[in-house]
Amino acid sequence: MDWKLEGSTQKVESPVLQGQEGILEETGEDGLPEGFQLLQIDAEGECQEGEILATGSTAWCSKNVQRKQRHWEKIVAAKKSKRKQEKERRKANRAENPGICPQHSKRFLRALTKDKLLEAKHSGPRLCIDLSMTHYMSKKELSRLAGQIRRLYGSNKKADRPFWICLTGFTTDSPLYEECVRMNDGFSSYLLDITEEDCFSLFPLETLVYLTPDSEHALEDVDLNKVYILGGLVDESIQKKVTFQKAREYSVKTARLPIQEYMVRNQNGKNYHSEILAINQVFDILSTYLETHNWPEALKKGVSSGKGYILRNSVE
């Protein structure tokens, strides 16, 4: 069968040209939209194909491409003009309001957060989350612990003076790790240490302080030379003194948050009072105290009203 080229070439239109309007926002290295770059490449291809066709068809091809190029050039010029006007507007606003801090880009803020966390790794306070007790927990409790780790890490990123976090007794093939990856977006990129070793073998025992509500000693200050340990344990059945007994096995110092010293029990209908906090709540208290050196303010940050405690000065 003989194929007729005459009269059919006008219907041939590059698929690249037909789909450009949806990708105007993507730009290449030269600042032009990728669609415009593809158009230029496609135009060369059309002209090469046009050399095989009749002279009249080739002339039509060139005019069609030129028309589309002019259309895209107008769009590109309009976008450049709009960006320039927006830049000049922001510059004028800064000149009129010199006291207002300029808004930083997300990339800049991420870099700033990364620098703060890496600085904490070398010179900041250290906090270990002891994850060696996951065998006590159900799948539901593991999911709750994974959520607490996410919130703790989020609070640490926002802190003016972050801790360096170390997840100890933590294996990548454990159910908890699977929950952390499933529930916490970007968990594998968290800026913290993950190790299978326990906290008692990583640091000198005399530098460790295990924070547990069962301790007899109230935490008076946050010592930058100490390594504080939080028990990664979500226990809905309340198995008492698990973390306290573990600290005693290694003759490690223990301390509790000074809730009894700065707070009192509040009367409530359920007569419920608890000093057991989630690890992210304990972290919020430590982080706030590190910045303010004010225990009432720090405890107010982490001890919710649902625990049945209020600050002493609230009663007075």
Swiss-Prot record:
One of its GO terms (biological process) is tRNA N1-guanine methylation. It catalyses: guanosine(9) in tRNA + S-adenosyl-L-methionine = N(1)-methylguanosine(9) in tRNA + S-adenosyl-L-homocysteine + H(+). Its EC number is 2.1.1.221. Residues 77-98 are annotated as: Disordered. Keywords: Coiled coil, Methyltransferase, S-adenosyl-L-methionine, Transferase. Residues 113-310 form the SAM-dependent MTase TRM10-type domain. GO terms for molecular function: tRNA (guanosine(9)-N1)-methyltransferase activity; tRNA binding. Residues 73-97 form a coiled coil. One of its GO terms (cellular component) is TIM22 mitochondrial import inner membrane insertion complex. It comes from the Eukaryota. S-adenosyl-L-methionine-dependent guanine N(1)-methyltransferase that catalyzes the formation of N(1)-methylguanine at position 9 (m1G9) in tRNAs. Probably not able to catalyze formation of N(1)-methyladenine at position 9 (m1A9) in tRNAs. Belongs to the class IV-like SAM-binding methyltransferase superfamily. TRM10 family. This is tRNA methyltransferase 10 homolog B. It comes from Homo sapiens.
